[in-house]
Amino acid sequence: MIIPFLLILLTLAACGSEKQQLTTLVFGRGSDSVGLDPGLETDGESFKVCDNIYETLVAYHSESTAILPQLAHSWDVSADQLTWTFHLRRGVHFHDGTVFNAEAMLFSLGRQFYKDHPHHKVEGGYRYWKDMGMDDILAELAAPDDSTFVIRLKKPNAPFLSNLAMNFCAAVSPTAIKKYGRDYFKNPVGTGPFRFIEWRKDERIVLARNENYWGPKAKLDRLIFKPIQEAAIRFLELSQGTVQGLDNLNPEYIDEIRDNPELQLLTQPGMNVGYLAMNMDKAPFDDLRVRRAINHAVNKQALVDNFYQGLALVAKNPIPPTLWGYNDKITGYAYDPNKARALLAEAGFPDGFETELWAMPVPRPYMPQPDKIAQAVQADLAKIGVRARIVQWEWGTYLDKVSNGEHPMALLGWTGDNGDPDNFLYVLLDKTAAVKPAQNIAFYKSEELHKVLVAARISADRDQRSKLYQQAQEIIFHDAPWVPLVHATQTAAFHRGVSGFKLHPTGSKWFHSTAFTP
């Protein structure tokens, strides 16, 4: 049980000197992590924990996607933009005491890149590596000496440096990978400000401050991630103090949090999208008229009004309006049930059809109430004769099944990883991302879109890239593989005594600077 465990911690804190402050923070969240191997995971709940265990060559600024040094203290790039040389920090150690150096970085990225690497073959594959197109970008990895790591590219790639700050490019302990093998995902070893202590599935993940950290040490002694699926129970535990922070707030509780002097609310425009994907490998969603009909059938404004308390924007594009390259000239598909019925009749379905609507079992940053969203979409579809049965699975199973294309329609979403449109459009909708296990769960395969996205990746000219991404959004709007639903405001709540935590555009949860203040 978590409550006795916390009482012990609180008692120990109280038994110390008068100056000793509470140094264990319990963070409530909607679901448990799937795994803790940064090269394998694709879900936000896993990244939340990995953010605090691992580090990358470069990192994002605490409040933006500007790139800063991390495990590399500096870097150089050749004039042709093909050779990147990273100068590594000395004196950095993994949590198991082994040394971080260029060979360790070569191992960390090499296991994903080199097919003959002894740890390359893993169940499900390195999906982020694949979906970011890293095999098409990289030519070679090299470690000429302990403090120098070199990456050579096949061709210039504009978002490359930003990609290196993402979780899948984190440094992992080669010794730990060799020791644990397939079980490494539940025995993580990185270089970050917190080290792994234990994982009791669906109860808690416990991290402890890394006392041997190379930089300023974390201010918390312990960091506990506690999964609480029910929104009402999560909020109750926050109110009672069993947890001191939580995210993915149910909008119903926003006013209560604002009115409670013991709590603080954090908000930020979300760099995300919640969407309904139609599997184009399955009839009738291989028919453009059907996909457009579904787009016209869903009342997005009602979703925002009823389930977000106004803390969201209606979506018309796959990327949020906070991101450069957004195409505001696109009008979107208006809510029009009559037009939807006419399109279905034209496609040969005058009486509609039966299908399944898959829905997430847990709240997400872009969809804090997926059950209610699914029910509302189901009701909208019924108005045009589409009889959709809602299907749910456990979170990890859900992700596996949709990535393998078992769904006809599925709700999902995305929070941007690096502040680049490429991270939405190429990762979620390019034809290369439709290879199973896929991030492109619409299984949309447009050669026209692919050419535009590849051109945008190669160009170093921001204005040119922006125009190409606007063109890409026009292609996607025409082909309608998704119903883009919402762009949600990012939210979190903490007790008044918690300080130093900042919401990040990528949704990352870094607790390095978080502390309790009197």
Question: Which residue stretches match the model-derived regions?
Answer:
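Gly/Pro-rich hinge or "lid" segments in bacterial periplasmic/extracellular proteins
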Residues: 61-62, 156-218, 222, 232, ...
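Surface-exposed binding/hinge segments that line
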Residues: 18, 87, 106, 124-174
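Ligand-site clamp/hinge motif
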Residues: 182, 210-256, 267, 387
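Aromatic- and charge-enriched surface segment that lines or borders ligand/interaction sites
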Residues: 73-119, 150, 237, 284
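Append "and occasionally in soluble cytosolic enzymes with long acidic Gly/Pro-rich linkers
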Residues: 206-209, 286-379, 445, 471
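Long beta-strand-rich cores associated with HINT superfamily self-processing modules
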Residues: 343, 492-518
